[in-house]
Amino acid sequence: MLSNSTFHEHHAKSHFHNNACQSNASSSACRASEDHLVSSFPNDSIIDLQPSRPAPEPPKKKFGYYARRLSGHFLSLIHGSGNSTRSPPFHLQNQKSNGQSEVWHSSDDSGSPKRLNRSRSSKEDMYRRRSLHGLPSLSRRNSKKSSTLSRSISLHLRSESAPISLPIHLYKSYSYNHSPSSLPTVLNSQALSSPPVPTTPDEVSTNRLSSSTSSMNCRNLVPDNFNISIRPNTTNYRSSIQENSNGNRDSISPSAYDAPLLHNVDTQSIDGFVSVASHFSSASTAESLDDGHSATTIQQGDVSSYPLSRSVSTPVPMSPISISPAKPSPQSPKLSQSAVGHPSSSIPAAAMHKVSYSDDLMRFVAREKYYLQIVDCLCTQKDPLFFYTDFTKICQQDTVGTYVARQTLDKEVVVIKRFDISAVTHRRLLLEELQRLSGLSHKNLIRYNESFWYLNNIWSVFEYKDPSTKLSALIPKYFFSELNIASICYEISSGLAFLHNSGIAHHNLTTECIYLTKSSCLKIGNYAFSSPYIERQTNRGAVSHVPDWLIEKNYKEGFMKDVKSLGLVALEIFQGQPNFFRKSIQSIQLTPNANVLVNRVRGLISQEFKEFLLQTLQAETLQGPNINMLLETSSFLEKRQTLNFEICLNNLNLRERKASRYSYL
């Protein structure tokens, strides 16, 4: 047991402890209820109220950003159970014109929300900014992509609508009423109205987007007489490939190049899914390139399209152009019966907007259209793989490939030349010669069958001749007399005369492209596509190798070059030696003159043959006769004798024929 003194001492301590606890509790309650003022402290203790350490600097950069977010989170946790309430999401707020906001306050007693009309506090502004942080914005950001999208904005008006690049510098901001029936058929500059009041979250988000778009000052960038025709969007944004009447797939018609003249911009409005399409056309283009498709019929509920054959994505990228009001269109668009009584249904004079293109663009469009018209008339727009099989590629030179194939039905062997028209530099010469080629038919020329247009390539089909029947394969084996040589030269001259009269120069006449037949007739190959539009003029027309030294850049002198080549062929047949163009050092430019060549065989040939060689070898100097004069006046060609080439062909050994089949590769 404790003594009396110890008990009294312990009792005094416990009494003091209880009084201290009560005073501390009362002071804490007072601090919770009211704040102390400096005047409540004694005057002597004011001097002692000094900070123990300097105040810390506010956080900076990213650390400050996260620190402010963390402090705001702590404040929301501390004051969340008090009277203050958290601001609701943005879609539950409705801003008023007087600066106040209607805040939805969730009461603790009842689950139903209550609406409070009061001014927004700074904490509510903070929560509002946080709710707007994840929403899409139309503001320009400091990124690489913003520089490329400076003139267009990607609009996502509805979840099911595709993003469309809208050039906002060409259009005014239009707004529509709620009912789709009240949509005007034609919107002019007076069809502006205030946006509707949003009632649903979708309309709120759409209204926010439209308000951001309308805030941009674009009204003064469009002429007042520029109008936009409205029609419901019932087709896909990308036009599909249409099947041409002459082909089955990937067919290209001349109307495909009318697409650069049309720039359609389709958007889906808030209600009605309307399609805003502005048809730009040039008056000068319609006069020079009119093919019956310049007028467009616009009907409500239907979208009239242009007959495009390629997959064309609109709007077509345009270069900087000058915009000017268009002249009145002679054929005005037709309107539906429901839009006749509408006050805005009258079509102004400048309903069609005019875009003035440069002269270079107009010439390019006209030239491409001319090319496609030729291709459409001369070529079959089908896949050649449907008609020919067993393709064997035998040579490839630049953009020209040569194939040996077999027809699917009658199994006839043909030669197919494939030209990539997009890679050919002089397409005009290629297509014009293809046009001439379709009318060529001569007994001394390799027969031309047909042409195909598929995947931007031209496939030309020719008659096939066995390489073992080439004249170069027979020269080392057999001796030809002057009468036989005269018969061969006459056959070659007849074929060249027909080519020259048709406006085609061969340029590549050698013994490698002359074929013998059993009907005692010669066939000249490699005559097609021999104009100087291909950089390297080798392996173009026949399945034989053609040297480069016979190619002449000057197209006008090509006819005389063919006459000189005829003389070299005659001299080679007589000598029975490897031809002059077997050696790279010998060419037309480096070969000796006519007198030197004739003196080598002097004493072995007749006078008529000597005169024939001098006339043909001097034709390059433009002093000799052309091929027509040579046929009429040459006495050497008159004493020709019919040669039976069947005997020569039958005497060839089968092994030699197989060895010479692909000797040119």
From Swiss-Prot:
It is found in: Cytoplasm. The keyword Translocase does not apply. It comes from the Eukaryota. Keywords: ATP-binding, Cytoplasm, Nucleotide-binding, Phosphoprotein. GO terms for biological process: intracellular signal transduction. Residues 388-637 form the Protein kinase domain. Residues 82-104, 294-316 have a biased composition (Polar residues). Its main location: cytoplasm. Residues 42-63, 82-152, 187-217, 286-343 are annotated as: Disordered. This is Protein kinase domain-containing protein ppk2. It comes from Schizosaccharomyces pombe (strain 972 / ATCC 24843). The lineage of its organism: Eukaryota, Fungi, Dikarya, Ascomycota, Taphrinomycotina. The gene is ppk2.
